[in-house]
Amino acid sequence: MENSSLLLTALFNPDHLIIFSKMLLAMVLGSVIGLERELKRKPVGVKTCAIIAVTTCVLTIVSIQAAEHYAQVSENIRTDPMRLAAQVISGIGFLGAGVILHKKNDAISGLTTAAIIWASAGIGIAAGAGFVFDAVIATVMILVSIRLSPLVQRWVHRKSQRRRTKFNILVNDAESIGKVTQLLVNNQYRIEHIQVKDQSSGEVRLQIRCFSIDSTMLKDAYALLKAEDGVISVEVDN
């Protein structure tokens, strides 16, 4: 009975309740981040992120309390209260490196999962140090970033896949290259890419890719190029 009462007294000690609440917060926030990875069937899920967050949280608490304890024992002892936390950040990198894969086609995968591991450690440290608001806001922002990134990527991809207009132009000689490109630039055509190929007959073939233009501008561009001295033929692919 005495042991049980001592245990209950220790559990309901205000200081111990604060420690428990910090570790519980770290576990919850780590699990929330890990759940996103779990739903995507990634190797790092709820359990891993929760373990990382709780462990870094308790190490941070120990680091801070140890610094305070030994400072009271002797005035000659001074330690950095966040020393253990700093070592955790360094060591967690090795765990993150284990999930990064370099495939045969030079593609690299696992970077987001590695970042999640590092983020879980950071949130655990924040919770352990008592920065509750920071830990919660960081978790929310991480989840929002993960959810929004596919939408942003699709939007950027659509923008990058805008239609292009390709001109395949055959000119008499190299001097006509500058005339043709300058003609397009002067008429507000945005050139994206130019490729020059010498022909066996001494002529030069230009392949010019411009950002997509409407049908009216396309007709004008075709007419301008056909009328230019030195231009033998013009092909347009829109």
Curated annotation (Swiss-Prot):
The chain crosses the membrane at residues 16-36, 44-64, 81-101, 123-143. PANTHER family: MAGNESIUM TRANSPORTER YHID-RELATED (PTHR33778:SF1), PROTEIN MGTC (PTHR33778). The keyword Coiled coil does not apply. Belongs to the MgtC/SapB family. It comes from Haemophilus influenzae (strain ATCC 51907 / DSM 11121 / KW20 / Rd). It is a multi-pass membrane protein. Keywords: Cell inner membrane, Cell membrane, Membrane, Transmembrane, Transmembrane helix. Its main location: membrane. InterPro entries: ACT-like_dom_sf (IPR045865), MgtC/SapB/SrpB/YhiD_fam (IPR003416), MgtC_SapB_SrpB_YhiD_N (IPR049177). It is found in: Cell inner membrane. It comes from the Bacteria. Disulfide bonds: none annotated. One of its GO terms (cellular component) is plasma membrane. This is Uncharacterized protein HI_0647.
